[in-house]
Amino acid sequence: MEWSDEGIILGVRRHGEAGAIVELLTRGHGRHLGLVRGGASSRLRPLLQPGNSVLAVWRARLDEHLGYYQLEGTRMRAATMLASSHAVYGITHLASLARLLPERDPHEDIYEMLERTLDDFDDVGDAATHLIRFELAMLAELGFGLDLSACAATGATTDLIYVSPKSGGAVSRTAGEPWREKLLRLPDFLREDNDGRNGWSDQDLRDGFDLTGRFLLRNVLEPRGQGHSDARDGFINAVAKHLARAAIV
């Protein structure tokens, strides 16, 4: 058995004295593990870092075997990402989200979104909005997508500023006003009628993480006996600290 594919490194763990088991999210073969001979060596250490993109060749005698990877770096992001705390927490959290997908099950849209998210991780605000969008995409991919296109109560497609914590549907300002204390806020940058000119605010980011966090916890994590990763909390705190420092300056 042999195939080649694009992949993003999610995690690496040592195997034996010199090898390493590398976990990739690949474009066409999903989340897939393989053994890299000599993967624990100093020569391969810069390559085998979470967040790096690679061209992977996988070989095994049978399809169900772990198999062996031969990897070639195509986008080496890790060195830059390791220099900022938000990026370190971010890639760790993104990897934990990707692990919610079944192994060896292709999810090309998620792969492409992860690629774009990592490419924009230099800017803290962009990283946060991309990560919130990635969490929304994961909810949809796992069968729990939110309908933010129209008001769940009236069908209106404009002035959507709330989300129902029960249905996951958007709610307009007028329809939601009587119950605003019980509704979740829909960040401006997630509104479909936002053409991008309005940007985002610190409150938008808090609302966004609250929104995706609640549905991930209730619909995906708690049924699996899990909670939010420490890396998610670390990312949110790192973003908040960075924005607070920027506001002072």
UniProtKB/Swiss-Prot annotation:
Keyword flag Cytoplasm: no
Keyword Chloroplast: no
Keywords per UniProt: DNA damage, DNA recombination, DNA repair
GO cellular component: a single term: bacterial nucleoid
Pfam families: RecO_C, RecO_N
Disulfide bonds: none
Domain of life: Bacteria
Single Gene Ontology BP annotation: DNA recombination
Family indicated by similarity: Belongs to the RecO family.
Function: Involved in DNA repair and RecF pathway recombination.
Protein's recorded name: DNA repair protein RecO
Gene from which this protein is expressed: recO
